[in-house]
Each structure stands twice: as structure tokens, then as C-alpha cells.
A protein has these predicted regions:
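Nucleic acid-machinery interaction/catalytic patches
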Residues: 1-506, 647, 651, 665-667, ...
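An acidic- and aromatic-residue-enriched active-site/binding cleft used to recognize and process polar
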Residues: 155-158, 227, 252-257, 275-276, ...
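Short secondary-structure boundary/capping segments
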Residues: 165-169, 261-268, 493-499, 545-557, ...
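Acidic, Ser/Thr-rich peripheral helices and adjacent loops at domain boundaries
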Residues: 191-204, 556-563, 841-856
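Short, well-ordered loop/turn and helix-capping segments at boundaries between secondary-structure elements
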Residues: 292-295, 308, 482-490, 529-533, ...
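C-terminal accessory regions
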Residues: 511-564, 867-897
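RecB-family 4Fe-4S metal-dependent nuclease core
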Residues: 536, 592-922
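Extended, acidic-biased charged interface segments
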Residues: 550-606, 872, 876-879, 884
Length: 922
């Protein structure tokens, strides 16, 4: 058997295809597998997490106050184990035997500790590459293999010691392209570059002061680009009509999947670049399942679990719960409870007829409402059980999957869940019964390592490809190095010079940093030196800097053939891209649409009146009709992952629910048929709010507010939000105390909260929830709307008689009661505790904003009705006004004299600005 071996050949192989029997190209894993099979040695098939946890147990057993890793291990044992496991693997591959001399020679403390741990690890931790090579080298002395010769694609002197010990026992021939001489035709730019680079490599102490000027003949060609997708498409078009695919090698060190996707779009066979990721949907399920166990609940993680494409809870259920969380971030609030109550067979019949509603409720209880634990300690038993439940779900999905790619994904995810369970059971076997969140997260990172995409594969007739430049060890007609990425300019060891010297004295042959840098440079130069006819280098502009090879080329050479791809395409001046022979097709520039003040629809497509409106929808219809159309007719909305309310919106919602719960709890006279039927569930009538003092309010808040925050405003429980939570809590306490003072001063006898009302309005109905519906001693009703902030703006509304929201609520109550007079209306500002009113006739301590116009709330409502008719006439005719920036009102924008003034500017909270056109500043 003839083996072609290279340290970087476990991935794609750029060597020409061969039909010779008994000849194979292998990388490290492949060669070790062949040798172990030939020698009858058992393979090492452990999961990486198994090795990690085994070594962690050794570190734990050897740990005491004197160990160098002691303090770090207490904080993050998984990360420490991973780091030291890497040290161990590198040492073994460099020739370590697992010990240091015990003849009284002083050993550095860290090396001594590593040797002490190794006494345990040798028998417990699965073998490293270096240990397997040492085992193979020992057996080769007494056993034979089928390998007759090894053609080495690396410099033998640069191989790690363990590899040299194995290869020294075979006939080895070094491939000619390992130390290449210039291969291009003399007189070409490529030959000049090869000659100069070879000369510089031969005398590294020398330095070329003057740049070598090239002739730009295209034999060495640089393609500059910003977009990787566009450059990949250009390379794909270049290769589409190539007569001999085997004459070209493509290098893509990273993101080769972009190149393969471009090949597929251009009908070029895929090379088989792999796309490795730990973020595939199925791989995230295990992490999300376990992330829900920590206290406090993380609403962002909860929403991710619910909107994730996959999960152990049926998708219709997750979607319904996601809606609840998006409105009230938390678990157990009103929206959450309502969503669960709505989960019945009739609700699900159209989407999931086979779902068992009782099992669904049990699953909801298990996954979302189980006990949660502090981040410093969760029971291993609970975590193992949850991982097992996740594994059972993955196994069920695997058994029903029919697509091979999907099966591979679920199989890999199931293996990850099994690996986690084994790791957790291993910790339990060591006597540990709890694990901290940071340690579990590290462990999850290990078991859910990057996963390849089973749907990426090489196709027949492809060009040769590789992900490492060092694998090109023979002359090639054309080399294309796509995406020369930034690399760290410096390398370093985590060990001191004294420790390195001691390791060297004990047979651990670690190359110097200088030797590593020189070897890296030689590997980078190898593709250029092995190119015979043309070398194409694709360089992308990046904020991360440039590849050291690019830095060297730009410092030594000038005037090569170069095209800036993005500029060439955007200018439209190149019908054929120079040196690539790629024909470009001109595309007319399509400017982005600019904002228009009016959208025009055919009359037959005009919007009919909706049966039901609210103040919110009417406000959009009156002042920003395009928002009304897109929100309520087109039903567009922002994505749920971006839709968790926060800031004043969240705090205001929390305050509304708090007021509702408070008055329901403390007043037996609340309306049991309307606004308060969904209150906290606490028995009312404990004591009247009229008799409460500030200390009573504080005690009630101390008991009830933390639960409410966890249920409906859990964002305030996230790390870093402690100050926000304290400020919001203090604001709510102050506001509630001051609200009670206002109510007592006004002689309020009855308080109804979140009072739902629906009444006829012109030819439709109007619906709303009144924050506070009050009744004083005379029987007069007062509607109060609570706002988190905006005191100045709300005061100006009252002064100008533009408080349309209060007018809406007052109209509904006037209509419902048949009263002759309109209810009194006021705003309560939560952040200041002030009550804003047009006079102090009801609330003696109100901040008075006398109306500056000779109109009252009835006149305001009449103007609103005229505005509604005006806007409906426009919509019926297909006219939709778009009140956005960079548009000016037209004559059609002027409202009738008896309507509300249409003087509002663009809505700064408009969700649809990108759908209404692009202005010059976009």
C-alpha cells in the first residue's frame, strides 16, 4: 500500500484523482485509523466531552490549595479542564511520556502538578493523538503492516516528535512540491514573484528594500472585493467553462460554503466544502431546554424556545405561548394563563388534530412551570432527567424523519444529548449532586461542538479544492486562493521560557515561535510556488486586517494585474472582467422608491370599514392612515424575536396590572362582571383602599410586586437590570400612594380598573379598556387614563382640547349609561404622581391645564366623528395618506373645518418606515 500523507489532509484533498490500486491519500486521523487496524489496536471512539469530563475528574481528585489551577478550577472547572487537556495533548504529540524526572531535580510547579494529575489520567482519560502514536510506534517494532511506502506532503523535520517516531519505521519519500522551485514560465509576473519569494525564503535575514515592478500580464492576478458572495460568483463564472477541472485547485481556508453555493448557482460542480456550525436549529434544542431551569427566568431565552423551529412542545402551542410572552415577558401572567386556557381541542383542530390536550398541559407544566434553581447550583438529577426527555423527543423525530440530511441532523443532536447525560452521570458517580450554570454551559459547548452540514457534498467533475494551502505539494496549472483571511500576526505559548526549557530537557520537542512562524510562511508560499500558469488571489476588504502573505506581497511587489470587482460591476464599464474572461450583463439601475405623500389604490381594491375600532386604531386612521392600513388591513407586525416590550412600554403595562390587582384586592365593590374579572385571583375585600396608609401600601407591594414582575416583566430580573428594577419599584410605590391621596381628596367611592367597554360609533363599534373608571359621592363618573410619562405632552393635549383618548373613553361611558353629561376626564402620570385635569373641580390637588379653546370634550368628539368620515371617504376612493419624513402635505391633506386638525408630523414610533420609501438620509 502506498500512502500519501499530510498533516492537513483530513479535509478536502487537492491531489488529482487516481485509479491506482493500493494508493490512498490520508490525513492524521485517516493514517492513525489504518495503522491501528493493521496492528490490531482498538480504536478510540470517545466523544470529546467524555475525554473532557474524565480529565476534569482527575483534576478534581488531585486538587488542593497548592495546585496552580486551584482557584480557576473552583470558578470554571470545565474551561480549566479543556485548557489543560489541550496542554497535555500537545505535549504527548511532541514526545512527552507522561512523567518528569523524580531524581530530585527541581521541576517547575505547573509541570509537577500536570505530572501528578497524569498519574490518574493515564488510566482514565481516552488516549490523545500523541498517545495513540506512541502505542503504534511501540507495536511497529514487532508487527508488520501493509504499508510499503509513505509519500510525505510535509517537511519531515517539521513533524511533531510522535509522528516522526512512527514514520521513521517506513520508507518515506518527500513530495517534490513540499520545497518547490519556481514553476511558471520565465518572464511572466508569476515567475518573477516565485523567484523573489524563493530568494527571500532562502535568506530570511536579508530584506528587499525596493519593490519589484511587475508587468501586469495576468499570470498573477488579484481580485479585490467587498462582498464574498459577489467574488465567489465571479470565480464560479470563471470556472464554468473550464476544459480541464483537474488542472485547477481552489483554496478556501474559511467559509468555503459560500464558494460552493456560488458554484451551484453557476452550474459548476460543488467542491464539497463543509459548513461547520454549532448553531443549527436541532442542535440548539438541548441548550434551550436546559436554559429554562435557571432562576430567574430569562424572557429572551424563553421566547427563543417558543419561536424556535423545533422543540419538544408542538409548534401550535409554542406559537400561542410566544404571543403571550411577547406581550407580557414572563411565565404565569394573565396573557400566559389565557393562552393556556385557550388550548383546547377546538382551537387546535385545524392545525394539530392528533394532539392530546391533557398531555399538552402536562408538557407545558414540565417544560415551563417546573421548579427553577439558582445559577450556582442545579440538581444533576433534574438536569439529567430533562436531557433524557429531550433525547427521547430527538429519538422520536429521528424515527419519523425520511430525508437523509434531516436524519443526520437528528442523529447528531441525539448523540449530543446522550453525551451530556453521560457527562452528568459521570459527575454524579464522582459524588457531585449539583452543578453551576457556568459549568453546565461550558459542558454544553463541548457536547454541542460544531456540526457539519450533511447536505453539503462534492459533485462529480469538480475542480480540486482544499481548505489549507499546505496541502498543495505538487505543480498545478492554476491556483485560485479565494478569500485571503486575516491571521494572527504573532504566536505564543502559555508556558514560561523556563518551563519550555524543562519540557525540552524531558523530550518534549516543541518548536520555537520563530520556527512556527517560518513554517507557516512556507506553507502560505507553497501554492504560489507550485502554480505553473496562473495564480488568482481573491482579497476581501476587512476591518480585521489582512493576511500576512498579503502584507508581504504588497511590500515587495507592485503593478500586478488587479480588478476591484465591486467598482467594476457598479460602474457598468466592464462588459468582460479583465483576466477572468467573465461576461457581465448590464442591469439598469433601479433607484429605491422615495416616499410619497399618497398611495393610490384602484377603487375596487379600496378598504372597507372595519366592524370594530379602538382609540389606538382610530388615532392611526386619523393622523397616519398608512399605519392603519398596514397594521389592521395588511396585518404586518415586527418579528416576535425583536418584540419584547421594554422601557416605558413595559413599565407602563406593569403599572396598569399593578393598579388593577391592587384595587381588586382591596375593594369588595369592584365590578365583578367587567373590568376586574381577570384580576390577580386574590380574594378581594381584605381591606378598603380608603383606609390604607403608605406603610400598608409598601407592605402589600413587598408581597405582590416581585411575583408580578416575574410573571409579566421578567426583563427586569435579568443580570444588570437591578437598578432599573429598584427604580421602577420605587416609582410604582410612590405613584400608588399619591394616586390614593388623589382618590381620597376627590371623595371617590368606587374604583373599577381596566374596565372593558364596547359601544356603537357611527356605522361601526368602538372598544376600549378604561384604566380607571371612578365614581364619586354624587354618582358622577370620571375616566382616568394612566400614563408612565409624558406629562408636558398630556397637559398640552388637555389645554388644546386634543385629548382624544380620554374623549373616546368618556364617549363610551356616556353612551353606555345614557347620561346627559359627559364623564369627567383626566390623566394620571405615574412617574410624577400628578393628576392632570382641565380644572380642580373633581381633584383638588390636580395639576390644572385650563383649556385654551372655547370647546369642550363633546366638541372634541364631534370633530373626531367628522375626521372619521373624512378619512373613510378617502379610503373608499383608494387614497391613503402617508405621513412620513420628506413628504409634504397636499391640498388633500387639509381636514374639513369641523374635523380635527391634521397637523401632526411623522410618527417617530412608525414600524413601517422602510416600507414607505427611502429618503436621501436612509
Amino acid at each position: 500500500m502506498l500512502i500519501r500523507f499530510g498533516l492537513h489532509l483530513d479535509g478536502l484533498d487537492p491531489t488529482p484523482p487516481s485509479t491506482v490500486l493500493g494508493e490512498v491519500t490520508l490525513g492524521p486521523q485517516g493514517l492513525i485509523g489504518v495503522l491501528e487496524t493493521n496492528l490490531g489496536l482498538p480504536p478510540v471512539l470517545d466523544h470529546p466531552a467524555e475525554r473532557l469530563m474524565a480529565y476534569r475528574s482527575c483534576l478534581d481528585e488531585a486538587n488542593d490549595l497548592t495546585r496552580f489551577y486551584h482557584r480557576s478550577f473552583q470558578v470554571d472547572p470545565i474551561n480549566v479542564a479543556g485548557t489543560l487537556l489541550d496542554w497535555r495533548a500537545r505535549w504527548y504529540e511532541a514526545g512527552w511520556t507522561g512523567t518528569f524526572p523524580s531524581d530530585g531535580t527541581d521541576v517547575a510547579p505547573r509541570l509537577r502538578d500536570m505530572a501528578d494529575v497524569e498519574i490518574l489520567a493515564k488510566d482514565r482519560v481516552p488516549l490523545t493523538i500523541g498517545q495513540r502514536l506512541q502505542r503504534i510506534a511501540a507495536d511497529l517494532g514487532s508487527r508488520r503492516t501493509q504499508i510499503q511506502k509513505v509519500i510525505l506532503l510535509d517537511d519531515p523535520a517539521e513533524l511533531p516528535a510522535a509522528w516522526r517516531a512512527v514514520l521513521d519505521q517506513f520508507e518515506v519519500e518527500v513530495a517534490p512540491g513540499v520545497s518547490p522551485t519556481p514553476n511558471a514560465a520565465p518572464g511572466t509576473d508569476l515567475h518573477t514573484i516565485q523567484t523573489v519569494l524563493a530568494d527571500l525564503a532562502a535568506r530570511p535575514e536579508g530584506r528587499q528594500l525596493d519593490k519589484t515592478r511587475l508587468n501586469a500580464d495576468g499570470s498573477f492576478f488579484v481580485l479585490r472585493a467587498v462582498s464574498r458572495d459577489i467574488s465567489a460568483r465571479a470565480i464560479a463564472e470563471t470556472l464554468r467553462d473550464t476544459a480541464d477541472p483537474a488542472a485547477t485547485v481552489v483554496i478556501a481556508e474559511a467559509d468555503g460554503i459560500i464558494l460552493d453555493n456560488a458554484f451551484e448557482r453557476s452550474a459548476v460542480p460543488r467542491c464539497g466544502f463543509q459548513h461547520y456550525s454549532r448553531f443549527r436549529a436541532v442542535s440548539q434544542v438541548l441548550k434551550l431546554c436546559l436554559a429554562l431551569l435557571w432562576e430567574p427566568i430569562n424572557p429572551h431565552v424563553l421566547l427563543q424556545f417558543l419561536i424556535h423551529p423545533l422543540g419538544p412542545v408542538p409548534s401550535p402551542i409554542r406559537r400561542a405561548l410566544a404571543e403571550a410572552v411577547a406581550s407580557e415577558p414572563g411565565i404565569g401572567g394573565r396573557a400566559w394563563r389565557t393562552a393556556i386556557e385557550d388550548l383546547d381541542i377546538h382551537h387546535l383542530s385545524n392545525q394539530a388534530k392528533d394532539l392530546d390536550i391533557h398531555q399538552i398541559r402536562r408538557d407545558i407544566g414540565y417544560w415551563f412551570e417546573s421548579a427553577r434553581f439558582p445559577v450556582d447550583a442545579a440538581p444533576l438529577e433534574i438536569l439529567t432527567e430533562r436531557a433524557q426527555r429531550c433525547a427521547n423527543w430527538l429519538a422520536a423525530r429521528l424515527n419519523t424523519a425520511t430525508d437523509p440530511g434531516e436524519q443526520a441532523m437528528f442523529r447528531a443532536a441525539y448523540a449530543q444529548a446522550e453525551a451530556l447525560m453521560n457527562a452528568l452521570k459521570g459527575l454524579a458517580d464522582q459524588g457531585q449532586d449539583h452543578i453551576a450554570k457556568i459549568e453546565l454551559d461550558r459542558l454544553l459547548d463541548e457536547v454541542t461542538r460544531v456540526q457539519s452540514d450533511p447536505n453539503t457534498f462534492a459533485e462529480a467533475g469538480r475542480v480540486r479544492a482544499t481548505s489549507h494551502p499546505g496541502t498543495i505539494a505538487q505543480a498545478v496549472s492554476q491556483v485560485i486562493w479565494w478569500d485571503l483571511p486575516a491571521h494572527p500576526a504573532e504566536l505564543s505559548y502559555p508556558w514560561s521560557q523556563a518551563e519550555l526549557a524543562e519540557l525540552s530537557r524531558n523530550g518534549v520537542e516543541l518548536p520555537s515561535i520563530g520556527a512556527q512562524l517560518e513554517r507557516r510562511s512556507r506553507l502560505w508560499r507553497r501554492p504560489i510556488l507550485n502554480a505553473r500558469q496562473r495564480f488568482i488571489l481573491v482579497v476581501h476588504d476587512s476591518d480585521q486586517g489582512y493576511h500576512p502573505l498579503w502584507t508581504q506581497l504588497t511590500s515587495v511587489f507592485e503593478n500586478w494585474a488587479e480588478v476591484r470587482l465591486d467598482e467594476a460591476l457598479l460602474s457598468g464599464s466592464c462588459e468582460v472582467l479583465p483576466h477572468l474572461d467573465v461576461t457581465t450583463v448590464g442591469v439598469a439601475v433601479q433607484p429605491l422608491p422615495t416616499p410619497k405623500r399618497w398611495w393610490e389604490l384602484p377603487v375596487e381594491l379600496a378598504f372597507e370599514a372595519r366592524d370594530l375600532e379602538s382609540y389606538s386604531s382610530l388615532s392611526k386612521l386619523f393622523f397616519h392612515p398608512h399605519e392603519w392600513a398596514l397594521t389592521y388591513v395588511a396585518r404586518l407586525r415586527t418579528g416576535r424575536s425583536e418584540d419584547l416590550p421594554d422601557g416605558p412600554l413595559l413599565y407602563g403595562s406593569l403599572a396598569h396590572r399593578l393598579f388593577e390587582n391592587f384595587f381588586t384586592y382591596h375593594d369588595s365593590e369592584h365590578d365583578s362582571e367587567r373590568g376586574s374579572e381577570h384580576a390577580s385571583g386574590k380574594p378581594s375585600g381584605k381591606s378598603s383602599w380608603r383606609d390604607l396608609h403608605a406603610t400598608d401600601v409598601r407592605e402589600w407591594l413587598d408581597e405582590h410586586l416581585p411575583t408580578l414582575i416575574a410573571q409579566e416583566a421578567a426583563l427586569l430580573l435579568e443580570p444588570g437590570r437591578g437598578i432599573d428594577r429598584q427604580q421602577v419599584s420605587a416609582t410604582l410605590e410612590r405613584a400608588l400612594v399619591q394616586l390614593l391621596e388623589h382618590l381620597r381628596a376627590a371623595g371617590i367611592q368606587r374604583v373599577r380598573t381596566e374596565y372593558r367597554e364596547e359601544q356603537a360609533y357611527l356605522d361601526i363599534n368602538i372598544r376600549g379598556a378604561i384604566d380607571l373608571l371612578l365614581t364619586d359621592a354624587t354618582g358622577q363618573e370620571i375616566v382616568v387614563d394612566a400614563k408612565w410619562g409624558g406629562e408636558r405632552y398630556r397637559g398640552e393635549e388637555i389645554e388644546a382640547n386634543r385629548h382624544l383618548q380620554l374623549a373616546t373613553y368618556a364617549y363610551m361611558r356616556k353612551t353606555a349609561t345614557g347620561a346627559n353629561r359627559w364623564p369627567y376626564a383626566a390623566y394620571f402620570i405615574i412617574t410624577s404622581g400628578n393628576l392632570l385635569a382641565p380644572d380642580d373641580s373633581v381633584f383638588p390637588d390636580a395639576v390644572v391645564h385650563p383649556q385654551a379653546v372655547d370647546e369642550d370634550i363633546a366638541d372634541l368628539w364631534s370633530r373626531g366623528e367628522s375626521t372619521y368620515r373624512w378619512r373613510r371617504e378617502q379610503l373608499d376612493a383608494g387614497h391613503i395618506e402617508v405621513n412620513v419624513a420628506e413628504t409634504e402635505p397636499t391640498a388633500r391633506s387639509t381636514a374639513p373645518q369641523d374635523a380635527l386638525e391634521n397637523d401632526r408630523g411623522p410618527d417617530r414610533f412608525d414600524d413601517f418606515t422602510r416600507l414607505t420609501g427611502w429618503n436621501s438620509f436612509s
